[in-house]
Amino acid sequence: MDVNPTLLFLKVPAQNAISTTFPYTGDPPYSHGTGTGYTMDTVNRTHQYSERGRWTTNTETGAPQLNPIDGPLPEDNEPSGYAQTDCVLEAMAFLEESHPGIFENSCIETMEVVQQTRVDKLTQGRQTYDWTLNRNQPAATALANTIEVFRSNGLTANESGRLIDFLKDVMESMNKEEMEITTHFQRKRRVRDNMTKKMVTQRTIGKRKQKLNKRSYLIRALTLNTMTKDAERGKLKRRAIATPGMQIRGFVYFVETLARSICEKLEQSGLPVGGNEKKAKLANVVRKMMTNSQDTELSFTITGDNTKWNENQNPRMFLAMITYMTRNQPEWFRNVLSIAPIMFSNKMARLGKGYMFESKSMKLRTQIPAEMLASIDLKYFNGSTRKKIEKIRPLLIEGTASLSPGMMMGMFNMLSTVLGVSILNLGQKRYTKTTYWWDGLQSSDDFALIVNAPNHEGIQAGVDRFYRTCKLLGINMSKKKSYINRTGTFEFTSFFYRYGFVANFSMELPSFGVSGINESADMSIGVTVIKNNMINNDLGPATAQMALQLFIKDYRYTYRCHRGDTQIQTRRSFEIKKLWEQTRSKAGLLVSDGGPNLYNIRNLHIPEVCLKWELMDEDYQGRLCNPLNPFVSHKEIESMNNAVMMPAHGPAKNMEYDAVATTHSWIPKRNRSILNTSQRGILEDEQMYQRCCNLFEXFFPSSSYRRPVGISSMVEAMVSRAQIDARIDFESGRIKKEEFTEIMKICSTIEELRRQK
């Protein structure tokens, strides 16, 4: 379809067209191969930014460490990580002066959270470095493996189920002389297949015990595994991201809880709120600066960009901040919070998979694992890789690189925001003591700075002072990438402000379309996305109507469920036509059963089953919503489900959609081939977990067992429930005395077994 693009813009104000320049249609770029090179880049760059710091050696692991704190003040505009402790502490003190009691109150809130948080908090999250297997696993599995190893090594505080007790075990584990772990390994052998008489490779999974000495265990506990960040748009080069292990995660969570609590109280912080709430917060700051810049004052805004925010931050600085913020708090609390930054200043970066070599002439491929990079002859590598390896070699231990300075991506978003806001806070006239003053917004590494002054020289002086203040705290504003405008036009975290926020619709484009979960969820998510964009993103009625028609078309092609009276032939058309002919009320058929689409922009909030219920034939209703239908493995459905939406950039968003259980809410069955891999153990654990949950549900039919509260275990809860129920049933005559006695006997046997365990 040829569209003359200029026609699109005839009636559109220029600022609304900004979103069409974004690279957000089509598939985002994904990375292939190993992330080893990107990780080495990160490690080398981080050390380069701090190169004039002091070198020391970690006494426990022998890792060389670079400490740039209180290092030489920069003399040029190159990025550097030499934060000055006294400056950071002073910035914190001024932040507290402007917000009396902010740290105190946040500490009290955090202490409550620390005492209540369950260890299952750590099961949230995707891939996690599993130190027992030395590779990534889903968070829940990694946690289960860690706890299993802890218990077999005599660390049992975690059995209370509280996160803080699990962390006590982590601390304890670091003092042990050795830790015994169970690792999985694959045996391959060539055997002759009886049927085909061909030779085949048979894989079996073995488990074996392995002892780690204190040094090896510490290295693993302090390791961050690295991967390549996928699906980043608008970038030529990929970059590495880190995933920490279970030892670090709990401590980071508590630090971020404190920092989040502080950010909520700071008007300049763009975190932890999002969406419309964030826009309102930002608009307030802008309004304040505009109204206070009287007719005599000029007001300018910088759309800011910081160079390599993470790589110039320093965990030692975070330790100083935490020490200051918690200074009047109980000793145990200060200790818990200071462990995360201490672990990060001793962190090790795992270099990933290593390099793949292939010889074209001999048709050979071989993998050089990261562990070998320390000793392999460099003649096999090209020039740039050779330089990287030479540079990183002094830092290598057991295939990981010592990385003391810098923070890996996304670890301390909240805490680093507090640091950024503390500089914005210094812009008040009572601190600048001159005619210029500033304010702004900070969200992790993104910032917008609003400077007011009587004349242009004042604006320039204000920006310079801000720039130099940032340098003292290890923040490097990029002079190349930041730009300044009259206040009223700027961009912050992909929100475009032009006398108010302009909808950046292109960011939402990737979430339109069919998600591919199942017929029921996809229909629901599809219409919800359109509805949400009408509410939040200026999606007009005509465009929404068109989006809806395109979505239905896309949906029908995806699930091959064209209307029963169509001419289109697909694999499903025979069944769909048959159903169409048998159905009296054709409007009642779901779109996924070849029915017509009854959605329009007025009824997007109603689930399709509800929309068509009154129009359905009775036997169709019975088949559609029958939990006993043998052809469906049913998902237990809550009234709301969550879909993970990937906006064009920024973190994945959770989107709620209505979930009505029908025979279309199927879950795809697991692929058999998983049973032959090292993941098999995980599968068995999952099934075990599933059986336990089913059993638990039989005792507590209405339960949602995801978050057990209180310290008693599932077994204790079931036993006491059985005893109570049995007594009630016996007293009301529903069961006989013999049955009652038998139940009580079984219960006491279980309790006895628990005690012996």
Curated annotation (Swiss-Prot):
Sequence ranges of Polar residues compositional bias: 55-64
State the residue spans of region: Disordered: 53-82
Task: Supply the alphabetized keyword list.
Answer: Eukaryotic host gene expression shutoff by virus, Eukaryotic host transcription shutoff by virus, Host cytoplasm, Host gene expression shutoff by virus, Host nucleus, Host-virus interaction, Inhibition of host RNA polymerase II by virus, Nucleotide-binding, Nucleotidyltransferase, Phosphoprotein, RNA-directed RNA polymerase, Transferase, Viral RNA replication, Viral transcription
- The RdRp catalytic domain covers 286-483
InterPro entries assigned to the protein according to its UniProt record, in alphabetical order = RNA-dir_pol_NSvirus (IPR007099), RNA_pol_PB1_influenza (IPR001407)
Listed under catalytic activity are: RNA(n) + a ribonucleoside 5'-triphosphate = RNA(n+1) + diphosphate
The highest taxon in the source lineage is: Viruses
Q: Name one GO biological process term.
A: viral RNA genome replication
EC number assigned by the record: 2.7.7.48
Motif Nuclear localization signal, residue range(s) on this chain: 187-195, 203-216
GO cellular component: a single term: host cell nucleus
Region of interest called Promoter-binding site, as start-end residue ranges on this chain: 249-256
List the Pfam families.
Flu_PB1
Subcellular location(s) per record:
Host nucleus; Host cytoplasm
What PTMs does it carry? Phosphorylated by host PRKCA.
**Could you give a GO molecular-function term held by this entry?**
RNA binding
Give, as one word, the top-level EC class. transferase
Quaternary form? Influenza RNA polymerase is composed of three subunits: PB1, PB2 and PA. Interacts (via N-terminus) with PA (via C-terminus). Interacts (via C-terminus) with PB2 (via N-terminus); this interaction is essential for transcription initiation. Interacts (via C-terminus) with human PKP2 (via N-terminus); the interaction competitively inhibits the interaction between the RNA polymerase subunits PB1 and PB2.
UniProt lists the family membership as follows: Belongs to the influenza viruses polymerase PB1 family.
Function of the molecule: RNA-dependent RNA polymerase which is responsible for replication and transcription of virus RNA segments. The transcription of viral mRNAs occurs by a unique mechanism called cap-snatching. 5' methylated caps of cellular mRNAs are cleaved after 10-13 nucleotides by PA. In turn, these short capped RNAs are used as primers by PB1 for transcription of viral mRNAs. During virus replication, PB1 initiates RNA synthesis and copy vRNA into complementary RNA (cRNA) which in turn serves as a template for the production of more vRNAs.
Name of this chain's protein = RNA-directed RNA polymerase catalytic subunit
Q: Which organism is it from?
A: Influenza A virus (strain A/USA:Phila/1935 H1N1)
